[in-house]
């Protein structure tokens, strides 16, 4: 029972941190004092569940990684058409961001500017994994469909991920007014016409 209660408190702390990142407070540095107040516990109680604020952010990053990579793998299992796979992966990341504005501050790096360098490296690694996955999807087109692209796969993967990252940054910069999935079909039509 004690383990379950501790697990629930950890989740409560992470949810509170995500909510703070989504609020106006998320535009500035979040202190453990503010977070403790939001959760309704002392700072010491926070540290009973997490050894540092960096570990709290890592908990959110782990959630982001698990959510995105699990769903990307599901897309790859279910869909075989190269362009549809790319479209679905792009839409997945944008929709995840739209549903989780606080976590988008982490994905964009905004919430990590004054935090431990290790956290920024984790986000960079996540985007590297996604870009590698996109590159692999693009490379497999030749095997699956007997077609190649007019441009190298690494350049296309970087362009696709750059489009996604730009949408995430715009979402954060606008204080979550510009939804990442707004006009997605039009953006996709433009992008896919360039890479067919």
Swiss-Prot record:
<dbReference type="GO" id="GO:0051301">
    <property type="term" value="P:cell division"/>
</dbReference>
<dbReference type="GO" id="GO:0043590">
    <property type="term" value="C:bacterial nucleoid"/>
</dbReference>
<comment type="similarity">
    <text>Belongs to the nucleoid occlusion factor SlmA family.</text>
</comment>
<dbReference type="Pfam" id="PF00440">
    <property type="entry name" value="TetR_N"/>
</dbReference>
<dbReference type="InterPro" id="IPR001647">
    <property type="entry name" value="HTH_TetR"/>
</dbReference>
<dbReference type="GO" id="GO:0000976">
    <property type="term" value="F:transcription cis-regulatory region binding"/>
</dbReference>
<comment type="function">
    <text>Required for nucleoid occlusion (NO) phenomenon, which prevents Z-ring formation and cell division over the nucleoid. Acts as a DNA-associated cell division inhibitor that binds simultaneously chromosomal DNA and FtsZ, and disrupts the assembly of FtsZ polymers. SlmA-DNA-binding sequences (SBS) are dispersed on non-Ter regions of the chromosome, preventing FtsZ polymerization at these regions.</text>
</comment>
<keyword id="KW-0963">Cytoplasm</keyword>
<comment type="subunit">
    <text>Homodimer. Interacts with FtsZ.</text>
</comment>
<dbReference type="Pfam" id="PF22276">
    <property type="entry name" value="SlmA-like_C"/>
</dbReference>
<feature type="domain" description="HTH tetR-type">
    <location>
        <begin position="7"/>
        <end position="68"/>
    </location>
</feature>
<dbReference type="InterPro" id="IPR054580">
    <property type="entry name" value="SlmA-like_C"/>
</dbReference>
<dbReference type="GO" id="GO:0003700">
    <property type="term" value="F:DNA-binding transcription factor activity"/>
</dbReference>
<protein>
    <recommendedName>
        <fullName>Nucleoid occlusion factor SlmA</fullName>
    </recommendedName>
</protein>
<keyword id="KW-0132">Cell division</keyword>
<dbReference type="GO" id="GO:0010974">
    <property type="term" value="P:negative regulation of division septum assembly"/>
</dbReference>
<dbReference type="InterPro" id="IPR023769">
    <property type="entry name" value="NO_SlmA"/>
</dbReference>
<dbReference type="GO" id="GO:0005737">
    <property type="term" value="C:cytoplasm"/>
</dbReference>
<keyword id="KW-0175">Coiled coil</keyword>
<dbReference type="InterPro" id="IPR050109">
    <property type="entry name" value="HTH-type_TetR-like_transc_reg"/>
</dbReference>
<feature type="coiled-coil region">
    <location>
        <begin position="110"/>
        <end position="142"/>
    </location>
</feature>
<feature type="DNA-binding region" description="H-T-H motif">
    <location>
        <begin position="31"/>
        <end position="50"/>
    </location>
</feature>
<keyword id="KW-0131">Cell cycle</keyword>
<dbReference type="InterPro" id="IPR009057">
    <property type="entry name" value="Homeodomain-like_sf"/>
</dbReference>
<dbReference type="InterPro" id="IPR036271">
    <property type="entry name" value="Tet_transcr_reg_TetR-rel_C_sf"/>
</dbReference>
<keyword id="KW-0238">DNA-binding</keyword>
């Amino acid at each position: 029972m004690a383990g379950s209660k501790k697990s629930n408190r950890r989740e409560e702390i992470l949810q509170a941190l995500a909510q703070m990142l989504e609020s106006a407070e998320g535009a500035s540095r979040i202190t453990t004092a503010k977070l403790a107040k939001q959760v309704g516990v002392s700072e010491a109680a926070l540290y009973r569940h997490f050894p540092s604020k960096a570990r709290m952010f890592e908990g959110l990053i782990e959630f982001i990684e698990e959510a995105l990579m699990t769903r990307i793998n599901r897309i790859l299992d279910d869909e075989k058409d190269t362009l549809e796979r790319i479209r679905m992966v792009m839409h997945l990341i944008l929709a995840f961001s739209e549903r989780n504005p606080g976590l988008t501050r982490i994905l964009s790096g905004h919430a990590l500017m004054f935090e431990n360098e290790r956290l920024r490296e984790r986000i960079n690694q996540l985007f590297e994994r996604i870009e590698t996955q996109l590159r692999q999807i693009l490379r497999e087109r030749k095997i699956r469909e007997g077609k190649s692209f007019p441009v190298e796969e690494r350049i296309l993967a970087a362009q696709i991920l750059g489009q996604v990252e730009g949408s995430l940054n715009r979402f954060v910069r606008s204080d979550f007014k510009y939804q990442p999935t707004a006009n997605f079909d039009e953006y996709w039509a433009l992008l896919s016409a360039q890479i067919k």
